[in-house]
A protein has these predicted regions:
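Conserved catalytic cores of soluble enzyme domains
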Residues: 11-123
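Residue-level detector of intrinsically disordered, flexible termini
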Residues: 4-5, 33
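Serine endopeptidase catalytic core focused on the charge-relay Asp
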Residues: 8
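Glycine-centered short loops/turns at secondary-structure junctions
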Residues: 3-4, 41
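Residue-level signal for alpha-helix termini/capping positions
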Residues: 1-2, 36
């Protein structure tokens, strides 16, 4: 934060290991705290290129701009499979289209190349 340079997060993570839950949850708390402290001070930009689930899903919600890859990107706190009747063929609540059009958590959806290009333009 001292230099005022933007923070850019490129996310693709299958989640945390239960064996490391306490340490991982503490790390999430530290990340969230630093994001909140940086809010309004420096730009925060997130690109989701694969799975972004569980506690990691809070990270893009705290950033200023969120980009998501349109075919492989998935964003969820609880697995979409945990919702009764949520079949991908009916409605994939973790998809880029859903997160952008219905949830409002994603600002830009596109291919990996498009997203990286738009992130460069934004910076």
């Amino acid at each position: 934060m001292k230099t005022g340079a933007p923070i850019i997060g490129l996310l693709d993570c299958a989640g945390l290991r239960l064996q490391e839950a306490t340490d991982a949850l503490n790390a999430f708390g530290e990340i969230y705290t630093k994001q909140v402290m940086a809010s309004g001070v420096i730009p925060q930009i997130t690109g989701i290129f694969g799975t972004c689930g569980g506690g990691l899903a809070v990270v893009p919600a705290l950033t200023d701009f969120t980009f998501m890859e349109d075919t492989k990107g998935r964003l969820f706190v609880n697995s979409p499979n945990a919702l009764e009747g949520n079949e991908i063929s009916k409605c994939d609540t973790s998809s880029a289209a859903y997160q952008s059009e219905h949830a409002g958590l994603v600002d830009v959806v596109g291919s990996e190349e498009e997203i990286l290009g738009q992130m460069r333009t934004l910076i």
